[in-house]
Amino acid sequence: MGLLTILRQQKLKEREVRVLLLGLDNAGKTTILKCLLNEDVNEVSPTFGFQIRTLEVEGLRFTIWDIGGQKTLRNFWKNYFESTEAIIWVVDSLDDLRLEECRNTLQELLVEEKLLFTSILVLANKSDVSGALSSEEISKILNISKYKSSHWRIFSVSALTGLNIKDAISWLANDLKEIKLGTIDY
């Protein structure tokens, strides 16, 4: 194997990013993934287990692990933390009855040693529906800033209409590029 081949392989590795797509069940994780992949968002069933999809964003290759959010599956999430560089956390902005559970579950993740230096993208999904909480309201409830001073952001999105989905994933890609270049503080 020549030096040029080794350098090319290293450059490809630098572009690869492992992303976990997490959140409570029925938040819209799989629908968001289908939206990102330009697939039909009307044909979605609950994820029991996980699925892995790849997506090119801003010159990075995201390997996205869409993992089911049912309570019985959350104990297995830790098995996927190794080498994770980003988490996309999906919140159902209509489900105010489960926001405390959502906050507690997210905060458990934020203190995991293997996830301390990950970028966190919070997607307040279903924001196109009347009665949805704003991203500001959800941000206040989740209280992420208590655990992370930087490298997180929240977007109000709609997986069904595509509202703000591309902007959100673009923010994540740019944040990860900044981290990979080593020009940031945690």
UniProtKB/Swiss-Prot annotation:
Record InterPro entries: Arl2 (IPR045873), ARL2/3 (IPR044612), P-loop_NTPase (IPR027417), Small_GTP-bd (IPR005225), Small_GTPase_ARF/SAR (IPR006689)
Annotated GTP binding sites: 23-30, 66-70, 125-128
GO molecular function, one term: GTP binding
Main location: cytoplasm
Lipid positions (N-myristoyl glycine): 2
Keyword annotations: Cytoplasm, Cytoskeleton, GTP-binding, Lipoprotein, Microtubule, Myristate, Nucleotide-binding
Keyword Cytoplasm belongs to the record: yes
Domain of life assignment: Eukaryota
Protein name as annotated: ADP-ribosylation factor-like protein alp41
Organism: Schizosaccharomyces pombe (strain 972 / ATCC 24843)
Gene name per UniProt: alp41
